[in-house]
């Protein structure tokens, strides 16, 4: 029996991006000596560094930092204000920070506690002998302010992942690594890449508001520090797993297992799920295990590790351009940049290439990585063997894109862009001013049709004409630039007014 859906029965619902990422970190309590606070700030305020990081990535709601130096001050702040995260910086002369964390955890068990410490062999030995049961994460401060952003986003992802994956299918990237120093370095690179990609994909949104909301649908990152934690996270999110990055050697059953990453890869492969897997190791000889798992391999000792990681994620996890390959030679046939480009080129993809990419879920991953969940969900559940031929596959992909674009365009006032306005566009504006009465009325009807789909039926379609509205600020610019207000509001006759208006130049935006 074919698993291909009947598109007439399939109704796409707009993704409620506004309901995603509802739990955020607004206030951070930093417990550190004055010297450690100064070292962290590096002659600049923590708030300013975080604000700059958020701004550079078009993120909103940067948290505020409150700094204290003692446990008593921390408990007093916690009594009087709400904090979503506590960061502790232990000093070698102050051995009570872990005891303080345990005491705080007793009174505030739901607030995550992170230990942030400079890296040294002495610190590593000390942490190995400490009771870390009250600590959620330990990070090594390497002088990079991007680590603070990564810590905040990691905690936010942990808080929001259960609801966001269940409600709309937000994807998960799992990093398995037990080296504090290494994941403290890798996570900032990983987050910066994912956030930059999401920022780029969000440009396909129809207006600034939708662009901001769509970034909430970016893939979330989860960190596992031992085999059991990796299996637990994988089992919980296996249906939403965009990809996995795993070290080769980490803790398994309480002891260091040099083949834990390989064993975890085997566990993943036994599920039969098609999930990209990147195996990392400090020993180049372990690439043979990656090959056996049909995984990519990265040498952790490589000086180009950040670039290698970015390249593998770009290739395997659905980010960047969709490169259509010849399955026999692995040569590039064509490159697809965005949704509209895929719609235009899908009928040009050769049969064998289409089978190759469909059988590996590359199309659904292309949609998932861009937070286009409705078409991704459909394609994910259609097996390549369900298609009677590849023409049927091409038609399904094309029709899904058309239906998705129509759904996204309905009831939305888009910003007019010449290269994007086509037969599937509904309503766009030029300018930032008021739509005016007629334009606002049409926009209202479009919004009602989207909000109440039962208004439409097979026998009675409700829609609005394709519309481009020139906003009032464009009209004002036209009038002021050409000095037409005195003419229009004066005593001149109609023929004179008409002559002045016909001579006038339109604003360059038109």
Regions found by a protein language model. Give the residues of each.
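Short, charged/polar "capping" segments at the starts of alpha-helices
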Residues: 37-40, 121-125, 183-184, 285-289
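Conserved phosphotransfer microenvironments
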Residues: 9-10, 39-51, 62, 67-113, ...
